[in-house]
Amino acid sequence: MEKVSFPVANTQLVGDLYGAAESGCRPAVAIIGPMTYQKEQAPTEYAKRLADQGFVALVYDSRYRGESGGEPRAWENPMHKVDDLKAAVAYLKSRDDVDPTRVSVLAICQGSSVAFRAAAERDDVHALATIAGHYRDQEGDIEWLTEAGYAARKAQGEAAKAKFEATGTVDYIKGVDQTDMNVGMPGDFVWEWYQPWADRGLWENQYAVMSDADLLSYESISAAKQLTSPWLMIHGDNCFLPGAARRHMDAVPASTKTKTVWDETPHLAYYDQAEVIDNATQQVVEWFRSA
């Protein structure tokens, strides 16, 4: 593994690069993870496997998280994540050991909605694969949070952002909690997965409240309508918001090459279950090679 860094908007992003070639050029993959992710979580599991298959694989912390710079910390800003991912693609294309015509993007959970916009705005992404995607449209957001919850969170986020812009003060809540629903990612099952990372000091259980002003103003279905990069979707009825996944697939232009792998695998199994990750990685490898 090689520790790397690259700039975006006067901020340094820090990443881990797997599979660097000693000679020649290899295909490469920029990997983005779920909401509030840090690179050592699910993205690294996929990066190691992709490197074993001959890819240069980059995982990185988005701005405001992990080893990467940016203030305020724990600010979840999807549009900034779009720019971060585009910068990661550009970094890979600049490397001597990477074939610049074969740089693809792999996205996990809510990273998928970011990847759509990044791929739509950069028409040189070789191929896109999304795993257990959290696809963003208002219908899905209301299904996720309820109509009242969506409105309350957005209003709370907008008030917190106005406070930050006026005073520089950042209001924080937890990222996850076992019982408290006023957190960035509510739900006991989410807490069960993330809290052990926090207990080991490998993930910060913190969420800037003003994030919701940006997060809940973001959608990805308009980007799906512009997608030209070949797209592999791995999803299923036991993954998050399957209806939103179907709406995004339906929105993609008919001229865009697509493939759907739909099964009964539980959403969080794609984060840490070795056999599930092995199988998903093989699907991704075959897709990127054939695109």
Segments (PLM) and residue ranges:
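N-terminal cap/lid segment of alpha/beta-hydrolase-fold proteins
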Residues: 1-24
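The serine-hydrolase catalytic nucleophile loop
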Residues: 35-48, 62, 244-245
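Catalytic nucleophile-loop/oxyanion-hole region of alpha/beta-hydrolase
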Residues: 39, 65-100, 274-279
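Conserved alpha/beta-hydrolase
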Residues: 49-69
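Alpha/beta-hydrolase fold nucleophile elbow
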Residues: 97-109
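Alpha/beta-hydrolase-fold enzymes
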Residues: 116-196
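Short beta-strand/loop motif that positions the catalytic acidic residue
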Residues: 227, 233-235
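Catalytic active-site module of serine/aspartate enzymes centered on a nucleophile-bearing elbow/loop
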Residues: 263-291
